[in-house]
């Protein structure tokens, strides 16, 4: 269990005021996101059938929460880790056209999450996906989209600051871009997480690109990514430097999704060629799914960031080890 206890931490909002602020942030940001990205709110599942191949395998070792159901006794159901693959299928199923997209209010359970100030077994995020042309599968498209999301976050920050002056954390005004290989070349002696902290402190807001493939120096990936949704050459994480905890905080993970060619290549690298037989993967390899860009934006993380909170448990209700609860209480961190 990792836990950062900031010195002299005193929340500026009561629990009830915090709850009101959470509602305001969520409603404000999703309106900004829908407007700036041009995406429509759609209903989304909390669970999928395992055999569909639609669940997010994350790093390949996390165990999904699974159960059976009376109505379909021979089908194994899984609570989603994310909606990365489901969204791409939904765009086709619901008849979305070129440059149209959707966003959802996603709730997930990640039972194997390592808990700390930023991580909970309960995940809530705005999951979004948008159709693009094959020729738009490039770095320019990715960076333009990142800047739109950053714009939505900054617009929300401005409104939250006006409503809760003195209780809003000030974000950087610009977002920079860097690749994982550039980070390794610059700080080869540091771990990937240490590199992220270094660049976040330096830039205040940064989008770290190309996550999932092996780096040249270490021969290891910067971080794990499932091989069947993001194109590892066209993805990344949006992170901010968070002064209260002297740490980086990741708010969004996103990317241009795999093409037929990159899916085959990445499944081979991950030794997951057997997934080619699953319904989703088969459709993709047969060219039956649209080319897309998409990602997730953490709802609790954004609330935590904008309200200057010390722990994600101050803005969402979850389950925490007793030791963590006690240490937080002694440091004026009141977990919901």
UniProtKB/Swiss-Prot annotation:
Cysteines joined through disulfide linkages: none
GO CC terms in record: cytosol
GO molecular function: aspartate-ammonia ligase activity; ATP binding; catalytic activity, acting on a protein; transferase activity
Regions annotated as coiled coil: none
Chief location of this protein within or outside the cell: cytoplasm
HAMAP family: AsnA
Protein name as it appears in the record: Aspartate--ammonia ligase
Naturally occurring in which organism (per UniProt): Lactobacillus acidophilus (strain ATCC 700396 / NCK56 / N2 / NCFM)
Gene of this entry: asnA
